[in-house]
């Protein structure tokens, strides 16, 4: 499958990275870092290894971003803002991030936010800065200010 000239060390590293990428998703930037580390900083050889992995579909930023967004939203309870920021830090393109975030069920995310704030509210009920602390907590989880403020205000008004 690989018709490019590559030395023995490059082929070994390529095989190792194929095994890694077949076990879980990696973004292009993470694979490039692993290749650079293994090749002692040889950027040209590392780029060649990454290009082969992308051509062979071992590395796909959209697939990585979709899995990352799904896991962080579903398992970690992160909001769209935090997921977007973390994927951008991984070097994933904006269009790919938007497409991956579009796959998240917004109604489930809203329910998760409500439950998250409701649970935190129970521990802060008597605190004079309850609203501020709830806002800060939910914003830190990566939810947008408007949706957080709406849920917090509703909860405090009807409690």
Please state what every model-predicted region is.
Residues 1-159:
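An alpha-helical, amphipathic repeat domain used for nucleic-acid recognition
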């Amino acid at each position: 499958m690989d018709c490019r000239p590559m030395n023995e060390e490059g082929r070994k590293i390529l095989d190792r990275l194929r095994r890694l990428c077949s076990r879980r998703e990696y973004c292009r930037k993470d694979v490039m870092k692993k290749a650079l580390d293994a090749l002692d900083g040889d950027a040209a050889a590392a780029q060649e290894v990454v290009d082969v992995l992308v051509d062979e579909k071992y590395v796909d930023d959209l697939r990585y971003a979709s899995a990352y967004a799904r896991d962080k939203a579903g398992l970690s309870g992160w909001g769209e803002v935090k997921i977007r920021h973390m994927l951008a830090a991984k070097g994933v393109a904006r269009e790919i991030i938007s497409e991956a975030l579009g796959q998240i069920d917004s109604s489930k995310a809203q329910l998760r936010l409500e439950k998250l704030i409701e649970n935190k509210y129970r521990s802060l009920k008597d605190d004079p800065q309850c609203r501020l602390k709830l806002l800060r907590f939910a914003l830190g989880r990566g939810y947008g200010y408007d949706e957080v403020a709406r849920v917090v205000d509703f909860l405090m008004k009807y409690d």
